[in-house]
Amino acid sequence: MEHRGVTVWFTGLSGAGKTTISHALAERLKAAGCKLEILDGDIVRTNLTKGLGFSKEDRDENIRRIGFVSHLLTRNGVIVFVSAISPYREIREEVRQRIGDFVEIFVNAPLEECERRDVKGLYQRARAGEIKGFTGIDDPYEAPTNPEVECRTDLEELEESIEKVMKKLTELGYITP
């Protein structure tokens, strides 16, 4: 499969399915011969952005750093999947402008569904006041106003979400089957 560099940014609440979709799709594209890297928010926080907290300023800096690395990879012909909550619209737009070749995927599931899926108990801890500034509970998540793709993970199967993203990447000329 031929491809060109692009950053595919999966955004949504914790537990919406960002990592599930991005990893399943990455496996398929890598098997087809695509150069692809995944920048997962949880992994990035323990390496690239270690030491940053969860204030708005720190979250924005986290996204800027992910965006910087994504831009370097994208301009060198790599498909980059970013799987990060990235709750603020303005910083996502800033990163989109910097990178250029950028496709936003809104991984959308209702808060109740995300809480039901929460294997780490983060939502429960946030509701109990043990975690402050948790996105979706006491810190806002600003949904994209015009994402290239919206995956409703409460209503569609994983394969349907993967196909929607593949179709869009093909339409935009980033991958050629």
Swiss-Prot record:
The keyword Kinase applies. It catalyses: adenosine 5'-phosphosulfate + ATP = 3'-phosphoadenylyl sulfate + ADP + H(+). GO terms for biological process: hydrogen sulfide biosynthetic process; sulfate assimilation via adenylyl sulfate reduction; sulfate assimilation, phosphoadenylyl sulfate reduction by phosphoadenylyl-sulfate reductase (thioredoxin). GO terms for molecular function: adenylylsulfate kinase activity; ATP binding; sulfate adenylyltransferase (ATP) activity. Its EC number is 2.7.1.25. It comes from the Bacteria. The active site is at S86. Transmembrane segments: none annotated. Keywords: ATP-binding, Kinase, Nucleotide-binding, Phosphoprotein, Transferase. Catalyzes the synthesis of activated sulfate. This is Adenylyl-sulfate kinase. Pathway: Sulfur metabolism; hydrogen sulfide biosynthesis; sulfite from sulfate: step 2/3. Belongs to the APS kinase family. It holds the Pfam family APS_kinase. ATP binds at G12, L13, S14, G15, A16, G17, K18, T19. It is an enzyme of class 2 (transferase). It comes from Picosynechococcus sp. (strain ATCC 27264 / PCC 7002 / PR-6) (Agmenellum quadruplicatum). GO terms for cellular component: cytoplasm. The gene is cysC.
